[in-house]
Amino acid sequence: MAVQTNDEIKGTEKEFLDLFNHLCYSRTAWQVWSDLMSAMACTIANVFETNPKRKADREKEYERCIKELGGDVEIPAKLFAIVTMALENNPDQDFLGKLYMQLNLGSHWHGQFFTPYDVCKMMSLITIGDTVRNKAEDRDYIAVSDTACGAGATLISAANTFKEQGINYQEKVLFVGQDIDRVVGQMCYCLLYTSPSPRDTR
């Protein structure tokens, strides 16, 4: 299968799924997705990591994931580039979360269902109004917390709403996300890094 060059990457769901499915020839979609998210998260985190042991541990995890993904970094790197391009084209979306649900990877045993991004955006628009704007002006920072963050749609939509309302979210807002599922937590981490929202990459 020919893999497109960076110049040809458009950042579409079809692009991502075509390449992703190529990795699923001998493994389940869940196994491939899990290793892909781990590899992406390790790549991002180690750019900023200063602790040698943690950096080495992530390198080992990255190498294991790439081996499971076929041993070639080309396709995982292209998939990461597609995600980045998709968010450059339209930062106001939950690119990975939408693909995750399209691939039926959600766990109904955990009650896992990703709220559509448009619903998250509507909630952000309702919540972030004059009161929040005034608090942001009066305080050192305000916090947005999601204790079941999934791929980060609530946090990303909040960041985009702050930006639209003229609030300097990079200096005035602390975004906190957590989830019981490590894989979706990594999805959130990757999207927050590649989206125009502030991040603490620890």
Where are the language model's segments positioned?
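Conserved SAM/SAH-binding beta-strand->alpha-helix loop
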Residues: 181
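Short alpha-helix immediately C-terminal to the canonical SAM-binding loop
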Residues: 185
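Conserved SAM-binding motif I beta-strand of class I
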Residues: 175-178
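Conserved SAM-binding loop
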Residues: 188
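Class I S-adenosyl-L-methionine
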Residues: 2-148, 152-165
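Single conserved hydrophobic/aromatic residue that forms the stacking wall/gate
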Residues: 193-202
